Amino acid sequence: MIGLLVSGHGSFATGLATSLKLLAGEQANTKFVDFDGQSGDDLKVKIAETLDTMKEYDGILVLTDLPGGTPYNKSVELKLERAAEQTIEVMAGTNLPLLLSCATMAGIFEAPMDLAQAMLPEAKDSLVVFELETGDDDNDDFGDFI
């Protein structure tokens, strides 16, 4: 099974944690690390300590909020430093639909990169803009989005 570690600015990670628990229940393979404004080095220590608790997994997919942000950069540093001991992949642009898909599919994939690659179309498809269709007043069905 793939382990998941979520990190982002402010309470991004714990906010997603509460939403994920509400939608999918407790996910034992998923850990959350917030970046509350401490130094980048302190965040790196927190992420490293969390990764240390996840060594039983086949690999770890780290899900962060912003590409190039401190949680992303420190996770990439740890990926490179631990390449010989732990398989770690790092992904940015995380949102709730992506996390939900990762959590429900983490047991299907053997490598975190395979899970990450499978999630890219899911992430893109989760972004939608509501458009009111005109010309069909009899159709009051708003689909699954309302």
Identify the function of each model-found stretch:
Residues M1-I146:
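N-terminal loops that bind phosphate or other acidic moieties
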